[in-house]
UniProtKB/Swiss-Prot annotation:
It comes from Syntrophomonas wolfei subsp. wolfei (strain DSM 2245B / Goettingen). The gene is rplV. Belongs to the universal ribosomal protein uL22 family. GO terms for biological process: translation. PANTHER family: CHLOROPLAST 50S RIBOSOMAL PROTEIN L22-RELATED (PTHR13501), LARGE RIBOSOMAL SUBUNIT PROTEIN UL22M (PTHR13501:SF8). GO terms for cellular component: cytosolic large ribosomal subunit. This is Large ribosomal subunit protein uL22. InterPro entries: Ribosomal_uL22 (IPR001063), Ribosomal_uL22_bac/chlpt-type (IPR005727), Ribosomal_uL22_bac/org-type (IPR047867), Ribosomal_uL22_CS (IPR018260), Ribosomal_uL22_sf (IPR036394). The keyword RNA-binding applies. Part of the 50S ribosomal subunit. Coiled coil: none annotated. Keywords: Ribonucleoprotein, Ribosomal protein, RNA-binding, rRNA-binding. It holds the Pfam family Ribosomal_L22.
Amino acid sequence: MEARAIARYIRVSPFKARQVADLVRGKDTEEAMAILRYTNKKSAPLIRKVLQSAIANAEHNFDMDSNALVVSQIFIDEGPIVKRMRPRAYGRADVRRHRTSHITVVLREREVK
């Protein structure tokens, strides 16, 4: 049984968010929350919020034990790029590309050995 949570159109670069996602992939939820709490990156609290939502979904929708959950999958997909103009000298303009991300967290129960 798997529980998931998805956050779409998050204003953070997918490349930078993937660096944080790689830290928690395969970890149990308590360890993942601790790692995200003390990671000093912009995407860490955003990913932590999605992880909390996935834990709540697992408890409420599937009656899973929150202490036995593992981050089985976490992936960051690219969202649409928001383009803005930046004025430059002599009447020119540059395009600023604000990247967005879709964050997906999938949890499963730890296998009993």
